[in-house]
Amino acid sequence: MTETTALASSTVSSAPLSLDLIITCADGLEAPLQTELTSFGIASEMKSTGRLAVTGTLRDLYKICLWSRVASRVLMLIKRKNINAEYDVAEQLYGLAKSVNWTEQFSLEQTFAIRLSVDKRVAVSQQFAMLRIKDAIADTFNEVYESRPNVDSKNPDFSIFATVNDKQAELYLDLSGTSLHRRGYRVAMTEAPLKENLAAALLYSAGWHQKNEAGDAPFYNALIDPMCGSGTFIIEALLMHCDYAVGIDKAANQFGFYEWQHHDAALWQEMIDDAQTRFRAALEIANEQPDTLPLIFGFDADNGAIIATEKNLIAAGLQDLLPLLDIETRALDQLSTLLKPLVADGRLSNPLIITNPPYGERLGDEEMIKPLYQSIGLILQDSFAGSGVDPMLGILASHVEQVDILPIREPKTLRCHNGAITVYFRYGTLIAGQTGNLVNRFEKREIEVEDGQDFINRLQKNLTRLKKLAKKDNVSNIRVYNADLPDFKVAIDLYGDYAHVQEYAPPKTIPPETAKKRFNLALMGIREVFGINREQIFIKTRARQSGNDQYSKQGNTEKRGKFYIAREDGAYLYVNFTDYLDTGLFIDHRNMRARIKDNSRNKSVLNLFAYTCTASVHAALAGAKKVTSVDLSQNYLDWGKQNFALNGLNVSGNKYQFVAADIFEWIKDNTEQFDIIFIDPPTFSNSKKFQGTFDVQRDHAALINRAMNRLTADGILYFSNNFTRFELDEQLTERYDIVDITQKTIGFDFDIKKPIHQSFEIRHRQSI
């Protein structure tokens, strides 16, 4: 059988040692590790998953242990031997271990431990095989000293790794000691922290280590981590930039080669001294010439995470750089407010945006994961829209589907592990966002339509007029047609790139064939005027509703179940064109939501009959100190939570509340006071969850009176409803200060002469 001995010399000699090394790393990090080793001037080749082979010198060994940011361990091959798995494998392992002169590796006074990895094709007791290797080492020492070193399985001076498959067995000495990923700076932690060497590997993958074309400055001029946790990406990026040898902190006593017989203490100290000198020099340059340091931004919605980041920066020896960094408590929804001015003045000319969002195990609620990742993409696109800057974006996720929705051009994906969790790193250039409103994109195209020219002309006239107004107000969702012509009874709403068409059920006097022909003509006209494909048009038939029918799911459709994203006044909102009669966004209340937004800063806001919480989102984005959304439907509240997450708003705390309850009962039992209350009830409801029925004309006075008990003395209650024959109870006008604001809340795309809703601003009467 073939045997290979990796270290032939028995004593320290003047000739350089030739070491066969295995450099281990987490699965998936082989390429970044190889990139790093190449930068050290060390050639390597892939041996297997998570293992790179290196033939090097003692200096190479020390360099890897001292400087590698990606490696986990450095193992030195002691001996390799072919085996026959059909025979006694444990005894073959004993023979292999017995053929090694262990006294050349460590002394009698030092402790050791055995680790064994057995291929599943090999039938052997792992515990017994480890015992036989230990026996061989003990026998070797007994033959020389008549004594043996002790075993310490928890904290040994030397760890011996053995691997065996059906053809070969190998013995390694762990010269790295404790895992190389431990930097020593993590004195404060947050939930599910990112491993240090994984963070470094991802920074390598994204190109953080690269220089510009001239080679005299970093390739990236900034690093942004919008959800920085305990600051691992930030710290690793700074350590990389400042030429810090990550093994320095371990140099005191934690490397496995310190008691090794071939350790060259003088060479090691020389390399330590050089590393410390390089780090001090880099820090000095960064402090004296701040422009040489890339801009570093670390944000998190959790102030505890920011405190942890600052503590870890200090522990990493980077305290002198703290004044040069922007580390602050900032929620994701506030990110674009900071980035846009920096992009505009050119300070973010080539940034790397890299982050580890609270995916899966960190977030807990799977329903919030997709909106969170979508929000990151949308917010960043908005921040860099129209700037000509193409930032690099790198994001981790626990499932590849989560990062599939990110707007990245020619994306690359790295499958790796953060501890025991499989994660995916998606990185590439951010696809630039679009400026301006979306309505202006619609351009007419010629389609042969035999009849229906009157409809086409009216639709074109409406669109031409409304596009100008939409551009002026930066509006993307509008109603362009509402049964303007008697033969074409449809309502057409534009949501960004999509048309939502509602056909009013024709009267019985119109033959079905005639109604169908007219509707098909309308669809052809829509395609011609808007220049869109059939897939961008969603159709519903609107008949008189009873009870909660408008909130019930509709019949089967090929496009059912898909959510689209609408933009409105700085907010992103999910809409569904297929599953319900309504889309989740009442565009006739656009001005009302803007009114609530304008008055919500530092206010407590209550949204009753909240539906999908669109008004709540606007209040939260405006800086409301608390927003409570109450609705009878948990499904719609869940939709509302996703709207919050889509805008980077954290729903896990107490700031934003979502309450599924009977509105009348809730405002009767709840005693909290609110600065702003918004009520937009249905015209009629007889839900099984509701106690009795609700009729807005009959019950609005009682509803408003109860709600006013929850309104602060100087607060505002906004009341709106869509009942066309609604009349406000006169007793309310006698009791409160009420202003009809209908004309101010009806948008430019609705007929003010036939208001689709009525709205009122209600306050407590002030004592004179």
From Swiss-Prot:
PANTHER family: RIBOSOMAL RNA LARGE SUBUNIT METHYLTRANSFERASE K/L, RIBOSOMAL RNA LARGE SUBUNIT METHYLTRANSFERASE K_L
Keyword Cytoplasm: yes
EC numbers on record: 2.1.1.173, 2.1.1.264
Stored Gene3D superfamilies: 3.30.2130.30, RNA methyltransferase domain (HRMD) like (3.30.750.80), Vaccinia Virus protein VP39 (3.40.50.150)
Main location: cytoplasm
Catalytic reaction(s) noted: guanosine(2445) in 23S rRNA + S-adenosyl-L-methionine = N(2)-methylguanosine(2445) in 23S rRNA + S-adenosyl-L-homocysteine + H(+); guanosine(2069) in 23S rRNA + S-adenosyl-L-methionine = N(2)-methylguanosine(2069) in 23S rRNA + S-adenosyl-L-homocysteine + H(+)
Molecular function GO terms recorded: 23S rRNA (guanine(2445)-N(2))-methyltransferase activity; RNA binding; rRNA (guanine-N7-)-methyltransferase activity
GO cellular component term, pick one: cytoplasm
Keyword Secreted: no
Function: Specifically methylates the guanine in position 2445 (m2G2445) and the guanine in position 2069 (m7G2069) of 23S rRNA.
Gene name for this UniProt entry: rlmL
Family from the record: Belongs to the methyltransferase superfamily. RlmKL family.
Domain THUMP: residue ranges: 60-175
Subcellular location: Cytoplasm
InterPro entries in the record: 23SrRNA_methyltr_KL, DNA_methylase_N6_adenine_CS, RlmKL-like_Mtase, RlmKL-like_Mtase_CS, RlmL_1st, SAM-dep_methyl-trfase, SAM-dependent_MTases_sf, THUMP_dom
Protein's UniProt name: Ribosomal RNA large subunit methyltransferase K/L
Keywords noted in UniProt: Cytoplasm, Methyltransferase, RNA-binding, rRNA processing, S-adenosyl-L-methionine, Transferase
UniProt source species: Psychrobacter arcticus (strain DSM 17307 / VKM B-2377 / 273-4)
